[in-house]
Amino acid sequence: MNVHEFQAKGILSGFDVRVPKGVVVRSVEEVDSALGSLAAGIVAVKAQIHAGGRGKAGGVKIGKAREEVADLVKSMLGSVLVTHQTSAAGQKVHAVYLEEGVSIKKEYYLGAVVDRKAGMVSVIFSSEGGMDIEEVAHSRPEMVVVVNVDPVYGFLDFHGRKLCYGLGLKKEQVVQITAMARKVCRALMETDASQVEINPLVETTCGEFIALDAKMTFDDNGLFRRPEIVKLTDPHEYSEEELEAAKYGLSYIKLDGNIGCMVNGAGLAMATMDIVKYYGGEPANFLDVGGGASKDTVREAFKIILRSGVDGILVNIFGGIMRCDVIAAGIIESAKEIGVSVPMVVRLSGTNYKIGKEMLDASGLSIVTAENLDEAARFVVDLVGKRG
């Protein structure tokens, strides 16, 4: 789950991370009141969407006079931002964050992410702030320092020294960066976040460090114990299909392609999308029905896939916990009830897969069965190509 910048800053400020004062507005009429609570001077006007790259897309501007800020807010609200992190359709702006300007001396990057392989929290620090950290790590790896933090002990002073001295910072800077990194680490661990990113973390001309931008991503599996985080969900940032999928416990992400994919297991779902693209197709979605899918779940999954106007459907199921014959029955019932009119290819493997395949072949429906994933991907891409 993602949250907006102003929400991430609200969370981080609760951990004593210093952020500029700001107010979120959702209409031009709110601008006067918002500016009245901010210090006079320049104001950063920031479109709030769940994607990075806003600045390059025109989603971050600087205003001074009230009229200028109001005009910027008016131009942003309702506009669609297309960045390198959005789909081609972009994301519509429903809220704008007005923030007091900061006198910047130097920009840094500070982030924390769960390293599942190491079983630790990786804290990343760079003296090249305001840029894509992956790009910096690729082009100038010497400017990025990473330390692994054991969540049992938390962020310790020696971690901070390693981060800062590796980039040649001064003693007074080390003290502040160490304190900031410790707070970021705590925020990640105590909110079940999977990522916290401050980019840029700025050093002001007064020598203070402030989070000028913030991003937080939360582990969906931990949300059941974080109701305060769930309340921050912005339905505007999700498609109708994604909201509907959440009601039935389905993991769904809408993509830009035309081949709908229904798979059980996130890893298998990603592999399925990869092989569809390998054969020249374009996945329309990521859809994981989970390990305990029922007939009802399969039916709702079909409805969600078809709602997005796909030209073909690929069902790839591995029967471990679930039985392939139960899935086959759900596919048949759903296809008859909904009336699937696009080509459908089904690949079943695992528990009772032979029974499931026989049920599909005997259903009288236009369902193509495949022996393996490679064959299934080729079939669906060919069928969609012929149809188009």
Curated annotation (Swiss-Prot):
Binding site for ATP: K46, G53, R54, G55, E99, V102, E107
Name of protein: Succinate--CoA ligase [ADP-forming] subunit beta
EC class (word): ligase
Annotated ATP-grasp domain residues: 9-244
InterPro entries for the chain: ATP-grasp_succ-CoA_synth-type, ATP_grasp_subdomain_1, Succ-CoA_synthase_bsu_CS, SUCC_ACL_C, Succ_CoA_ligase-like_bsu, Succinyl-CoA_synth-like
GO cellular component: cytosol; succinate-CoA ligase complex
Catalytic activity entry: succinate + ATP + CoA = succinyl-CoA + ADP + phosphate; GTP + succinate + CoA = succinyl-CoA + GDP + phosphate
Pfam families with a match to the protein in the record: ATP-grasp_2, Ligase_CoA
Glycosyltransferase recorded as keyword: no
E.C. number(s) listed in UniProt: 6.2.1.5
Cofactor(s) listed: Mg(2+)
UniProt similarity note: Belongs to the succinate/malate CoA ligase beta subunit family.
Co-factor note (free text): Binds 1 Mg(2+) ion per subunit.
GO biological process, one term: tricarboxylic acid cycle
Keywords: ATP-binding, Ligase, Magnesium, Metal-binding, Nucleotide-binding, Tricarboxylic acid cycle
Superkingdom, taxonomy of origin: Bacteria
Molecular function GO terms recorded: ATP binding; magnesium ion binding; succinate-CoA ligase (ADP-forming) activity; succinate-CoA ligase (GDP-forming) activity
Pathway given in the UniProt record: Carbohydrate metabolism; tricarboxylic acid cycle; succinate from succinyl-CoA (ligase route): step 1/1
Chain residues that bind Mg(2+): N199, D213
Protein's job: Succinyl-CoA synthetase functions in the citric acid cycle (TCA), coupling the hydrolysis of succinyl-CoA to the synthesis of either ATP or GTP and thus represents the only step of substrate-level phosphorylation in the TCA. The beta subunit provides nucleotide specificity of the enzyme and binds the substrate succinate, while the binding sites for coenzyme A and phosphate are found in the alpha subunit.
Positions that bind substrate: N264, G320, I321, M322
Subunit structure: Heterotetramer of two alpha and two beta subunits.
Originating species: Anaplasma phagocytophilum (strain HZ)
